[in-house]
Amino acid sequence: MKKHLFPLFLLLIGANASAQQDFFALVGKETPNIVFNDFRAIDGLNGVSGETIFTSDSSAKVFSQNRNSSVTEDKNTFSNAQAINIATLAYDPSSNNLVYMPMFSSNIYVLNAKTKEITLVENDIVRVTSCDINSHITRMATGYDGNIYAINNSGTQFLQISKKGNQYVVNDLGIIKDDLDNAKNSFTALETGFGGDMIADAENNFYVFSASGNVFKISTKELKAKFVGKISGITENYSVNGAAVNSQGKVVVASAKGAALYEVDLKNLQSKKLAGEQNLHIYDLASKYFANDRMTSGNALANLDIYPTRVDEHYINVNVNDKSVKGKLTMTVFDLSGKSIMKQNLSVRDGSLNQQVYLKNLVNGAYLINITDESGKALLNKKILVTE
């Protein structure tokens, strides 16, 4: 893995970040079968449930992007926004959307966590049949590039869900194959590699946590799955069905069978049980965080922010409404290597600023915006994604 030389503030930010909804669970009913109950916020540090976002009994407002109209779905089918067999979940923080798929359907759903409006993305790329366990989409996560990724059980489909303008686009990136050194710990075998969930790291690699507890690193360039090891410290016969990175950079895993959540250190795969709820049936987890990420967002002031964080028109807005902020500010844009690639001076008058900043010559990708005051104190550090 590449070693980046980051400015000191990148190692320290995040300590003052306020609590927010950034970690979510797909929760089932108390039954041995997969039966969808709700999407909910959850505390990724202690395993305690928060606000319920959407349930199996909620009124579903579904808009089909293909048909450009609202649709009424048949709840008795496998292809609806509240199907009983949902097993994948990802979180897109740039739009506050939860993205998910029913396990036996090619439909992709995008649920806005605030408005509860749902966009249906129909497509002919996903090849799923209910009777073929190899084809079931069971792992999903947001990549560091801002796109959503999903993998079926056998690795024969590696899906990318991206947004072009106002439309979601689905692509199949190809077949993921076993690394030659995997031996008996095969990514493509039911007993060792199927099911579970996936997370992303800061270099847009992925880690699949299979139901067996085996962990595989997925190289997106080579489309290979390399066996990393097996989680230690979880109870015997624990089924790993959800995985997501928390705000401390640890991986939280959960089980569909009704069990405690565990926090896993990706460096050594050692786990410890979280003290929260001990019998949640969790089919998938999702968060805004990434493994090995030194660019975690932080904001020292509640009334200083930038928007949008997904930039598709080459500019951002800087907004200040805080009497304690005075004089000149410096906004610096860093790339993923920690290199300063752009600077802009900002002037605050009477604690107020609302300025549009043009991001010239920035190619698509992730960047960090750092804003400091005249003394050099960091007031804001926030990641943005530049897209077309």
Where are these regions (language model features)?
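Bacterial Sec-dependent N-terminal signal peptides
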Residues: 1-23, 309, 333, 379, ...
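An edge-strand/N-cap motif at the start of beta-rich repeat modules
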Residues: 19-52
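Conserved beta-propeller blade signature
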Residues: 21-28, 97-101, 147-151, 205-209, ...
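Beta-propeller fold detector
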Residues: 48-76, 118-129, 168-184, 224-233, ...
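Repeated scaffold domains used in trafficking and secretory/extracellular systems
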Residues: 62-65, 75, 79-90, 127-141, ...
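Blade-level signature of beta-propeller repeat domains, shared across WD40, Kelch, NHL, RCC1
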Residues: 254-296
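Residue-level detector of functionally pivotal "anchor" positions at catalytic/ligand-binding pockets or at interdomain
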Residues: 288-313
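C-terminal outer-membrane/trafficking sorting elements
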Residues: 305-307, 312-388
